[in-house]
Amino acid sequence: MAGHSKFKNIQHRKGAQDKKRAKVFTKLIREIVTAVKTGSSNIPENNPRLRNALTAARSQNLPKERIDKAINSADDANTENYTEIRYEGYAPNGIAIIVEALTDNKNRTAAEVRSGFTKYGGSLGETGSVNYLFKHCGVIQYPTNIASNEDIFEAAIEAGGDDIVSDEIFHTIYTDIENFSKVLEFLTGKYGIPEDSYIGWIPLNTIIIDDKEKAEKLLKLVEILEESDDVQRVFGNYELSDDVYEIIQGEE
């Protein structure tokens, strides 16, 4: 997977999310509820998706009482049922975008996503129009100070990980989707709760954005998509150049 060592770009997006913690919590709670409903169990040991959702929630410091409330509410017949939907399209300059959503109203979500693409010069395509440019896999991230490159590499391979990339910010472990829960559980037992963990779409190759105006327009598109409570994650096959990244960071 080319270009996947440059996780400073993802850190930029995470920083934007941190400013909207209430929305982050809403997305986490929605995933917990969906995990219980689709997994037919509110017991983490019997429900891999719920285990993964709880790890993600704890990494974002979602309070325990809200986690417990979400798990219990999933058994309530009045609790909304959420549908998983994937949207695909292009941002300006040929950047492929994948949007994953959990929604109780498909029409509302589709309208919000389409509006976001249109507002910033993108175009929403059919499902399957860009996913061939990505690998669907598990991603687990730890800060680099958690362990040496060698130690975490050995642990990841022992756990069943496929690949690991270490840079100045993260150790990033990639897994097959089938092995994700097993690897996450192993590494959590060894190193604690990761900085982030999810099943997502990682670009096979990335397009370097070396123009500040183009980068700002792209990041605004990603941000407006992420602002929707229905949208869980946004993925793109882009990477900011070092110079552009430093300029944008300096303006925030």
Curated annotation (Swiss-Prot):
Any idea which GO molecular function terms this record carries? DNA binding
| Transmembrane helix is among the record's keywords | no
- InterPro entries, from UniProt? Integrase-like_N, TACO1_YebC-like_2nd/3rd_dom, TACO1_YebC_N, Transcrip_reg_TACO1-like, Transcrip_reg_TACO1-like_dom3, YebC-like
In this chain, the stretch annotated as Disordered covers 1-21
Listed GO CC annotations: cytoplasm
- Listed GO biological process terms: regulation of DNA-templated transcription
- Domain of life, source organism: Bacteria
Alphabetically ordered keywords of this record: Cytoplasm, DNA-binding, Transcription, Transcription regulation
Q: Give the primary localization class.
A: cytoplasm
Q: Which Pfam families match?
A: TACO1_YebC_N, Transcrip_reg
Subcellular location, record wording: Cytoplasm
Family affiliation: Belongs to the TACO1 family.
Q: What protein name does the entry list?
A: Probable transcriptional regulatory protein RF_0799
This protein's species is Rickettsia felis (strain ATCC VR-1525 / URRWXCal2)
